[in-house]
């Protein structure tokens, strides 16, 4: 009797090899970061005074403003800070914590109320209290515009637009939302601009580094970047030691615009800090699961397109993923079928 062999039965090697490819792709990001020395330079115990630490904890919601805090509440605040930033939890102002406090970051407070059970869904991602999101007819279309008077002297407007188109595309590829650029700043859903110091929203910027940008929760749509930063799109061209990657910050702030808070996963786009001269432009699983739980899934999205996002150029409508994504999708579909039929 002729036995019909399933094509996968004889080929455990190819299956293992395909997994190795997927594994390589997952680890791409770590490899890229390892090549960038600024990601891994650890300061010796930095010199930060206790009053400065307390000010930082107040600014980001860990300690009440204008109130003298006792040692117990200071220690509790440090524990919450360490937990929210994925640091070793010691309750002490140790060198890991101080190095983190010195890093440039998003100006949005971290989600720190101890009573966040309803929003902290056991995952690392976080929503704003009450889970606000953009509620419109599906498929959701949001417009965005740049304030023409408030751009950055470091970049050409075409570069700024290109970077934001790419950053919006990252989110559009995983949720059923499309982002459309408009000239009309006044009526745009999402209003993007670079501002100096006090700019009228009660959240003044602080000059070079420190706070890089801030955003308001849905459905406000204001996305403000600190004009004092040396914004960069290409570190080969921009040599400044305090240069900040615009795309990394754009991806993060758009996450807030959509309703995500800060994540404690260091590789997530929604992690609050970003070192100067470093890039973090891809969504992490944590970001994807978080935003999909608010808006649902883009019908074109597959996990493999996320894995292949290193090499994809998603358009802002999220519809096109380059051929590499297709190869990975096909590979892993084949793998899945092999396992089902083994």
From Swiss-Prot:
Residues making up the signal peptide according to the UniProt record: 1-34
Record membrane topology: Lipid-anchor; GPI-anchor
Biological processes, Gene Ontology terms: proteolysis
Stored SMART domains: ZnMc
Disulphide bonds in the chain: none
InterPro entries: M10A_MMP, MetalloPept_cat_dom_sf, Pept_M10_metallopeptidase, Pept_M10A, Peptidase_Metallo, Peptidoglycan-bd-like, PGBD-like_sf
Cofactor: Zn(2+)
Proregion span(s): 35-124, 318-342
pH-activity note: Optimum pH is 5-9.
Activity control, per UniProt: Repressed by acetohydroxamic acid (AHA).
Any one GO cellular component localisation term in the record: extracellular matrix
Temperature dependence as stated in the record: Optimum temperature is 45-55 degrees Celsius.
Note on domains (UniProt): The conserved cysteine present in the cysteine-switch motif binds the catalytic zinc ion, thus inhibiting the enzyme. The dissociation of the cysteine from the zinc ion upon the activation-peptide release activates the enzyme.
Protein name: Metalloendoproteinase 4-MMP
Gene giving rise to this polypeptide: 4MMP
């Amino acid at each position: 009797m002729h036995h019909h062999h399933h094509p996968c039965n004889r080929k455990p090697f190819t299956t293992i090899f395909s997994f190795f490819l997927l594994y390589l792709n997952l680890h791409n990001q770590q490899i890229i970061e390892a090549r960038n020395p600024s990601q891994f330079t650890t300061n010796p115990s930095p010199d930060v005074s206790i009053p400065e630490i307390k000010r930082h904890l107040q600014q980001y919601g860990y300690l009440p403003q204008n109130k003298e805090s006792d040692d117990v509440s200071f220690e509790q605040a440090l524990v919450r800070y360490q937990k929210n930033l994925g640091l070793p939890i010691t309750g002490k102002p140790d060198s890991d914590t101080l190095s983190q406090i010195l890093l440039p970051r998003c100006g949005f407070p971290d989600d720190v109320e101890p009573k966040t059970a309803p929003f902290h869904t056991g995952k690392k991602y976080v929503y704003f209290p009450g889970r606000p999101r953009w509620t419109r007819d599906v498929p959701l279309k949001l417009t965005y515009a740049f304030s023409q008077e408030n751009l950055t002297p470091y970049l050409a407007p075409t570069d700024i637009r290109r970077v934001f188109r790419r950053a919006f595309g990252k989110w559009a590829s995983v949720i059923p939302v499309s982002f459309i650029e408009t000239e009309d700043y006044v009526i745009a859903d999402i209003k993007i601009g670079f501002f100096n110091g006090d700019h009228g929203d009660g959240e003044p910027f602080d000059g070079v580094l420190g706070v890089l940008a801030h955003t308001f929760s849905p459905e406000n749509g204001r996305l403000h970047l600190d004009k004092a930063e040396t914004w960069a799109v290409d570190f080969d061209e921009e040599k400044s030691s305090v240069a900040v990657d615009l795309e990394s910050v754009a991806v993060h702030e758009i996450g807030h615009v959509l309703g995500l808070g800060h994540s404690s996963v260091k590789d997530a786009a929604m992690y609050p800090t970003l070192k100067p001269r470093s890039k973090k432009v891809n969504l992490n699983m944590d970001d994807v699961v978080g935003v999909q739980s608010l808006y649902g899934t883009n019908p074109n999205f597959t996990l493999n397109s996320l894995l292949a996002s290193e090499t994809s150029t998603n358009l802002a409508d999220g519809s096109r993923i380059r051929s590499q994504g297709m190869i990975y999708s096909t590979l892993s579909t084949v793998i899945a079928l092999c396992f089902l039929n083994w």
